[in-house]
Curated annotation (Swiss-Prot):
Lineage: Eukaryota, Metazoa, Chordata, Craniata, Vertebrata
Membrane topology: Lipid-anchor
Known partners and oligomeric status: G proteins are composed of 3 units, alpha, beta and gamma. Interacts with beta-1 and beta-2, but not with beta-3. Interacts with KCNK1. Interacts (via C-terminus) with KCNK2/TREK-1 (via N-terminus); this interaction confers ion selectivity to Cl(-) and L-glutamate.
Role noted for this protein: Guanine nucleotide-binding proteins (G proteins) are involved as a modulator or transducer in various transmembrane signaling systems. The beta and gamma chains are required for the GTPase activity, for replacement of GDP by GTP, and for G protein-effector interaction.
Source organism of the structure: Homo sapiens
Protein's recorded name: Guanine nucleotide-binding protein G(I)/G(S)/G(O) subunit gamma-4
Tissues where this protein is expressed: Brain, kidney, pancreas, skeletal muscle and faintly in cardiac muscle.
Modification Cysteine methyl ester, positions: C72
Length: 75
């Protein structure tokens, strides 16, 4: 019974150490305000709008996924 408790506390200590390491890593990360991140994202999207095929469709002649116009007849 004592061995089971020891194993449980070892697991708990291991999990706590992992949590502390994760928190230390997160504390060192540079933070950006949401308003600044949103402004940066909007500026990026506006700068690359001409390259976005979801906004400006790919011309049919360049679209590799266009429907093929070949017709087959089975005799």
């Amino acid at each position: 019974m004592k061995e089971g408790m020891s194993n449980n506390s070892t697991t708990s200590i291991s999990q706590a150490r992992k949590a502390v390491e994760q928190l230390k890593m997160e504390a060192c990360m540079d933070r950006v305000k949401v308003s600044q991140a949103a402004a940066d994202l909007l500026a990026y999207c506006e700068a690359h709008v001409r390259e976005d095929p979801l906004i400006i469709p790919v011309p049919a002649s360049e679209n590799p996924f266009r429907e093929k116009k070949f017709f087959c007849t089975i005799l």
